[in-house]
């Protein structure tokens, strides 16, 4: 029975060590991404807009169009953009 506990303990240790290695890799990658944003900023690009572009590129076209339509609806409701009337669309 102690052999089974030893195997479980070894498996648990292996999982923990793999997760720790992956967490370290994730931190390294996050640091690399931060460096790229800094480099882009130093070249005159807006990091906030770059993040937005990357976010948009991750979406599929239908999802993006749906979100843009909802955003337009909210902005129109707040008077931040002119409302499109039915006669204007025709």
Curated annotation (Swiss-Prot):
Protein family: Belongs to the UPF0335 family.
Organism whose genome encodes this protein: Rhizobium meliloti (strain 1021) (Ensifer meliloti)
GO MF term list: DNA binding
Pfam families according to UniProt: GapR_DNA-bd
Coiled coil: none
InterPro entries reported in the protein's UniProt record: GapR-like (IPR018753), GapR-like_DNA-bd (IPR046367)
Protein name: UPF0335 protein R02793
């Amino acid at each position: 029975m102690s052999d089974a506990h030893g195997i479980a303990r070894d498996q648990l240790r292996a999982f923990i060590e793999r997760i720790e290695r992956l967490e370290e890799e994730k931190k390294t990658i996050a640091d690399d991404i931060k460096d790229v944003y800094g480099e882009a900023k130093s070249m005159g690009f807006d990091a906030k807009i770059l993040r937005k572009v990357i976010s948009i590129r991750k979406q599929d076209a239908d999802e993006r169009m749906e979100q843009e339509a909802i955003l337009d609806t909210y902005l129109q409701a707040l008077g931040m953009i002119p409302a499109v009337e039915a006669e204007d669309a025709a």
